[in-house]
Amino acid sequence: MENILNLRSLMNQAMEADVTALRQFLTTNPGQPLVATGSGGAESVADFAALLYGANGGLATAVSPYTLNSFSDDTLKTAKLLLVSKGGHNNDIVFAAKRGLAVNPARTASFTLYTGDRNEVRKAFAKAGSTLSFDIPGLRVHDDFISTQTPVMYFALLCRAFDPDIDLSKYRTAPAAPYRLERNDGTALDPADFKDVRSFIFLHGSWGRPAAANLEGKLVESGLCPACVLDFRNYCHGRFIFTSAHLEDSAVVMFVSPREKDIVARTRKFLPASTRLVLIETETDAPDASLDLLIRSSAFFFDLCAVTGTNWVSPKNPGKIDKRQPMWVPFMAELKRSGPLTLRKDRTL
């Protein structure tokens, strides 16, 4: 995993990057709400930004670009907007950037990693004369079909944006034991024992949600299997029934920080002994706990791909879906046609 993620290079770059302007945007006036959005592999990055903004005393939420672009201009004026995109050229994020710059230019910011000619978001900010395009030139980040290095870089940069004194050097090397696999009765398992899993339940608490959301995307985009992302409370509220009904072909992944130790122990008390568990744990109770969980969950993903013969670099496409056609679905054109969400009852489409 260390070679795949190139952790030493990513952490060195993240520690050397100048995130001063990004920090000022995210930590100044925390009383203003923040709406963060990310396209593709950056969705979990927006989730992490919102989590950190909340931990810093502000109110924040992460939404998809489609949802953001469903909001009215008046709605977009009520909050800071953070648009996350590695390349800055997907139509949805470009559309969101142009709208934000038109109606809320003083509080619309972009956070991209690529500064080349295809970065249309960066061009839009330059044309508008905005200084809130937070691009970090010279970063060397490589992804294939599935984003692997980009989320790690983003998480590291956000950790530094909110905590300039944070030490990321310990993440230069992969943990020796990034996760534990076992049945709920303590019987040790290995990745091959999860080959027949057809669905996962991901349970998270405080720092775990961004990493859980990221792993869900990896599993689905690689064609491995779907996963349901829940916090521990929602699982205990009734969704444990799925585990009870699918012991033969499901597993539970627990994202654990020091805050969830007791909750995890109590949750395990009611699970059947044969329940397959993936325990992804961090000893950190700070922003980099999410980074730690992201790295550890990535290790599980790569190992699961290895035992199932899944090519995450270029996943199989047995249904032969033309990969260009999903990109051609006219989401933004339809949003322009139908207009923003409204409570008015007299509208017809």
Residue ranges and their predicted role:
Residues 139, 158-192, 314-348:
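Internal, active-site/partner-interface "lid" segment
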Residues 10-17, 58-62, 87, 176-183, ...:
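Short, flexible loop segments at the rims of nucleotide/cofactor-binding pockets, characterized by
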Residues 2-8, 128, 250-251, 256-262, ...:
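Phosphate-moiety recognition in structured ligand-binding domains
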Residues 153-161, 217, 221, 291-306:
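Short, hydrophobic/amphipathic alpha-helical patches that form generic packing surfaces
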Residues 21-79, 194-245, 299-302:
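Anionic-ligand anchoring segments at beta-strand to alpha-helix junctions in alpha/beta enzyme folds, i.e.
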Residues 1-29, 144, 149-152, 159-167, ...:
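Cofactor-/ligand-binding subdomain signature composed of acidic, glycine-rich
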Residues 13-31, 179-196:
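A short, well-structured juxtamembrane/interface segment
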Residues 27-178, 246-283:
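Glycine-rich phosphate-binding loops that contact phosphosugars or nucleotide phosphates
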